[in-house]
């Protein structure tokens, strides 16, 4: 019975993802459908259209098995080793610079929001 419950919960999560993909495609949005699906799930949870218990076990299972979702990326790295050998240093620099930018902007925004929140109190 547990597998049926788990399968149903995962199916419900995928329904949100598929709905988000459909909305993104139909509306020609530049936002990934999976992000729209997560937002739809958030709204559904916030307004109690979907209860946390309905998806908890399925979400926990997917998080535990998250490493399986990275296997295709690892295979792609191996498959395109010629491209990586040609542009590898450039890609590493781009990844490092973009990570640094994201970290700095996140830190600055966090400080700004904390200062603003502190001044309100």
Swiss-Prot record:
Cellular localisation: Cell membrane
A single GO BP: programmed cell death
Keyword Membrane: yes
Primary residence: membrane
Bilayer disposition of the protein: Multi-pass membrane protein
Role, per record: Increases the activity of extracellular murein hydrolases possibly by mediating their export via hole formation. Inhibited by the antiholin-like proteins LrgAB. In an unstressed cell, the LrgAB products probably inhibit the function of the CidA protein. When a cell is stressed by the addition of antibiotics or by other factors in the environment, CidA possibly oligomerizes within the bacterial cell membrane, creating lesions that disrupt the proton motive force, which in turn results in loss of cell viability.
Assigned protein family: Belongs to the CidA/LrgA family. CidA subfamily.
Protein name (Swiss-Prot/TrEMBL): Holin-like protein CidA 1
Taxonomic lineage: Bacteria, Bacillati, Bacillota, Bacilli, Bacillales
Gene this protein is translated from: cidA1
